[in-house]
Structures are given as structure tokens and as C-alpha cells.
Amino acid sequence: MTRTPPSETLSRRTLLRWGAAGGTGLALSPLAACAGPTGAPGPGTLTLGLNRSLVSLDNKLNQFDAAVTVQRAVRQALTAIGPGMKPTPVLADRFEMTAPTTWSVRLREGIRYSDGRPVTVEDVATAVRMYGEVAGSFILGLFPELPSVEATGERTFRLHTRKPVPVLDRLMANVLITPAKDNRPEELRSGVGTGPYRVVSANSGAGEYTLARVPDYWGRRPPVERVRVLFVPEESSRVVALRSGELDVIDTITPDSAEQLTGLPGVHLEKTSGVRICQLFYNFRKPKTHPLSDPRVRQALTYAIDGESLVRDVLTDSAEQAEGVVPLSLQGAERTGRFVHDPGRARQLLKSLGADDLKIRIMWESGEFAADTSVMEAVAEMLKDVGVRTSLLQFEPGGDILKWRQGKGGDWDVIGNGFPGPTGQAVTMLQAMYAGTAEDERTGDAFMGYVNPAIARQISDAATETDTAARDRKLAAAQHAVWDTWPCMWAFVPKTLLARRTRVEGIGLLPVNSYDLTAVRLEG
């Protein structure tokens, strides 16, 4: 459904305050098909209320931040990114670079899937191949190249790459292992994993799952017997359900909701810095004659956005304006510049470039980031102030926005998009967003159509550098080059915030907005 800005004139301050309160006329009603939680959790059941629909417990296409918590409870990888954003062993007990293009890996002894089948080297080889074959894979874009798998024993194998991939131990944390005969180049809706929980019921269309503890799990026995996962898109409903005890944990909440929950008996807030960047990213598939194909026009539009007001009044200081093309908390990130609010300059530049009668379509998926609708409504008003007409297109979770991102669903100009930093390394995020090639774009897999061969070469060169200091220097140059192309109208880095009932203990919230369910316990 397309929504357009309100016709009456509002001051920017009024709109920002109105948007922060969730009262703008553009706000879409919650999905009627998505029911809220019913009844309090049992004494041995942990109930999670997610802000986005978890359509699969596989991650080939679907890995938003909070989903990782649930997906890794069922399926696991060779490694995981743990505290301090460092790689830790999971299914592998050895993962070593033994040559610039070779890693030696050994599977843990005795690891089995929840149905009793042993994990094999063939399962790993098949998993790597399936991630490479799936269309539109988010994970594939993180890799400079996928490794090949050479079995050297019953539990041992080597990972080979054509060029060095010095962060391969981090990247492989995103490849979840499934029995080879069950794996396919698609998002799996069923099947078993090696994790501490198995699926006992699932309604992927509604984003609802019930997980039960695996009795003979190979690792540490999780204290919680059952986990119930619900999709509750409306934040107010999630807050009410948490307060009443119907939900135990809710993720990705706004500061307004956090303020409501602060100090309430039985409720506790968890907060940490984040490694996700949220962007108003331009569509780089526009014809060369389109105004947005001109980086000067893209830059001019950035002056229309009052980022400080958005952070202060809509996001209520739960985020920081981006000062680089990736979050500065990532290893190798470079401060490249700042977004400046100057509407007079925006109007002047747009007029001088013949783009003073511009109309743009902004799209996003509900739940992409906290207060997303309010941010978009405020942005529409700011653009109106410099003479740019807008239409807003909001997708509900589970829709076909992926096709639009790939240029296969319809035309758009700007997308509200959140991109995670799942390895803690700037090079991974840069690889996924800005190292796309013409070959990638033939299948729609270049990020929003961004193809710049010179920048792709810079990033690829940095990605193969084994010396950390040298890699960071190369990455810094690449990041400045990206910034100068003006890929975003605006960007910010949100803080990670969730709320839990005090009966829930042991949540070690990571900057990637996930936590290890095996450490969670229920008190009382």
C-alpha cells in the first residue's frame, strides 16, 4: 500500500514530536492476521516477542539481528561471534589458518543432530555450496569468495580459497550446518540442527515457533525447557504484554517504550552499543539520465535531512548519526564525514542541477528499525521543505520487499534499510554493500544495484590483506571513496536495547542484538 505525506503543512518540530509519539496520520495499522500473545508463560517456558516475523529458522535469506538468537538455538555453525566480537568455536574445536589461502578445521567429537545423526564433513561441504547457490542470499554477500572443502579425515578438513580471506573464521559463523541430504539452495522451513533446541511446532507464516530442549544435546544443557517465539509487530502490544507477564523478552524497542518500562517492578532493560547501520539508501539501478544517478543530486538531498532533530526528537537519543559508511565500532572502520543540515543549500543545489521538481518514492519494511515509520514521515516533511515531493511505500514483514531490493519488484528511489555487522569487521560489511560486480548485478545481488568497479577492487584488495594494519589502511581509502559517491541520503547507528522480565536471567546481550539461549535461565 502506498502512503503519501499529509497535505496540510506542519512545522518540522511539530511533525518530529508527533512522529515520536506515534500519532502521525501515516502510521499503518498492525496486521490483523498477527495475533498478540495470549496467557502467561509457564514456569519452564521462555516466551520471546519479536518485532519482525521470523519466516524461517534457516538464515540463507533471513538474518535480521534478533533472529540470530532463535536460529542458533536450532542450527549452529562451525564458529560463533561471542563477547568482544571475537570468534569462538562451536561445532569445530580447531579452526586455524595454516597457509594464506588454507584453514585447517576439525569437528568436535561426538556432535550430533537432534535426531541422532552425526555431523559429517560432507554436511559442511554441502552447506557451503547451498549458501552459494541460493538466489538473493544475504550471507553470500559477506564473503569475498566462498571456500572449497577438502576432507582430510572423518572429522577433519581444509577450507581453501583462491586468495587469502583472513577473517574466514568469523565469516563461517554465518553458515549454519544441516544434514547434507536435507539441505537445499533455499530457505529451509523445516529440518533438524545441532543446537540445544528442536522445533516441536511451527507456523512460519505467522512467525510463531515452539522449541523444546534436546534431551541429549552434545553441549551444555540449557536451563530453560521450552522457548516460545511470537511475532508481535506493534510495539505498544509488546510493551503491554511484557508488563502483564505474557511475554518474557521483547527486542528492538524505542526509548519511549524503554522510559515507560524503566523502574517498573518485574521488568529490566538490557542495553549495549550496536554494530548495525540504518540507512536511507539510494537506488543505484536508475537510468543514467535520472537525477539520482548524479552524485551531486544525491549529495544535495542529504542537506535536506535534519539528522540531529531525528536523533533527538524521533529516535530520542537511542542512536547516533553515522560519521562513516559503516559503524565506527567495527574493526577497520574509518570516520569519513558528517551529514550536514542546510535546507537552503539543498534548494540551491537542486535548482542548479535541474532537479528542483524531483519526486521520490521511499520504501521500507515495517520493523526495519525502531520508530521506522516516524522517521520516514519526518523525512518526507523535510524533503517537502526543499521542494521534493515524496510517496512512502511500507511493506509488512513477510512480503516481497526482497524482489524490490533486487530490482525485480518495481521502481523506487530510496530504501530504509538496516544492515548488521555480524563479524565485528568493517571489511565484511563493506564487502556486502559496496563490492558488488556487474556479474552480481545480473542476478540482482549487487546491494541496491551499487556497482563501482574501482571501489570493488579497493575493497577486494583490502579483504585479502593478511596484515591487519595494512588492511585497515586500504579499507580507510575505500571508505572515503564510498562516501564520495553519496550512497545514502542519511544514516544512523542505533543502540541495542531490549526489555525482559526479571525472572529471566543470563541474557548476555551482544552488539549484534542477539544472545546465547543456552545461558538463559528462569528464576522463581
Which residues are covered by each model-predicted region?
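Periplasmic binding protein-like
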Residues: 48-49, 382-438, 445, 474
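N-terminal lobe/hinge region of extracytoplasmic solute-binding protein
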Residues: 50-99, 129, 192-194
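Gly/Pro-rich hinge or "lid" segments in bacterial periplasmic/extracellular proteins
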Residues: 86, 170-222, 226, 344, ...
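Surface-exposed binding/hinge segments that line
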Residues: 96, 140-181
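Ligand-site clamp/hinge motif
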Residues: 185, 215-260
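Append "and occasionally in soluble cytosolic enzymes with long acidic Gly/Pro-rich linkers
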Residues: 292-381, 385, 449-451, 477
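Extracytoplasmic/peripheral linker and loop segments enriched in polar/acidic and small residues
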Residues: 389-400, 431-501, 524
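Long beta-strand-rich cores associated with HINT superfamily self-processing modules
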Residues: 498-524
